[in-house]
């Protein structure tokens, strides 16, 4: 389908962005880009290395620059990094240029999905020690509470806790198509109303 162009997927690490994103893009006939992978490709190193060698500010600058380039594209699903909405400039770009979709999961589900991963800084304590599932869940709850005000502004929100990935993608595809059609109808109506006022 050819319609309204740029879809940003947000949500906590483990919410299903990198799994659902390509499937959703395929279902819509769009391209797919993972923002973090795009940044790593540009920098020629992993995000962990960027943070360690050049600091967070360098990473945030790369994040914003990469996002700016993507906002000029159409028919694209973009999976966002977990904290990208906390960057005010990135947040503004996203809200002005596309549809924001929040993939929502409970701290318990997220902790269960993430506890076997070994490469996530989130899973480590102050001195690099591995956290228990309960500690991870508590840490996730704290971060989610901080991010929730931005997540709450998403155009669409989909629960990814217990559903099969396939049914989530189907539901999301239908919802996005409906949302885009309604947005286009509202835009055309506004345009028509404006034209009438000018006459």
Swiss-Prot record:
Its cofactor is Mg(2+). Its main location: cytoplasm. InterPro entries: P-loop_NTPase, Shikimate/glucono_kinase, Shikimate_kinase/TSH1, Shikimate_kinase_CS. Its EC number is 2.7.1.71. GO terms for cellular component: cytosol. GO terms for molecular function: ATP binding; magnesium ion binding; shikimate kinase activity. It is found in: Cytoplasm. One of its GO terms (biological process) is aromatic amino acid family biosynthetic process. Pfam families: SKI (PF01202). It catalyses: shikimate + ATP = 3-phosphoshikimate + ADP + H(+). It is an enzyme of class 2 (transferase). ATP binds at residues 14-19, 120. Substrate binds at residues 36, 60, 82, 147. Keywords: Amino-acid biosynthesis, Aromatic amino acid biosynthesis, ATP-binding, Cytoplasm, Kinase, Magnesium, Metal-binding, Nucleotide-binding, Transferase. Belongs to the shikimate kinase family. This is Shikimate kinase. It comes from Chlorobium limicola (strain DSM 245 / NBRC 103803 / 6330).
């Amino acid at each position: 389908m050819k319609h309204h162009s740029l879809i940003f997927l947000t949500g906590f690490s483990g919410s299903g962005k990198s799994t659902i994103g390509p499937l959703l893009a395929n279902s819509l006939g769009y391209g797919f880009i993972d923002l973090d992978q795009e940044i790593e490709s540009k920098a020629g190193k992993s995000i962990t290395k960027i943070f360690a060698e050049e600091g967070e500010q360098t990473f945030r600058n790369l994040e914003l620059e990469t996002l700016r380039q993507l906002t000029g594209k159409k028919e694209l699903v973009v999976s966002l990094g977990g904290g990208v909405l906390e960057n005010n400039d990135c947040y503004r770009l996203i809200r002005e240029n596309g549809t924001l979709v929040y993939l929502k999961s409970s701290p318990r589900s997220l902790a269960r999905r993430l506890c076997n991963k070994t490469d996530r800084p989130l899973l480590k304590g102050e001195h690099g020690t591995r956290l228990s599932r309960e500690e991870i869940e508590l840490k996730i709850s704290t971060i989610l509470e901080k991010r929730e005000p931005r997540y709450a502004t998403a155009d669409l929100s989909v629960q990814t806790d217990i559903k099969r990935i396939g049914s989530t993608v189907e539901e999301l595809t239908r919802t996005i198509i409906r949302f885009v059609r309604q947005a286009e109808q509202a835009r055309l109506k506004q345009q028509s109303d404006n034209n009438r006022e000018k006459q």
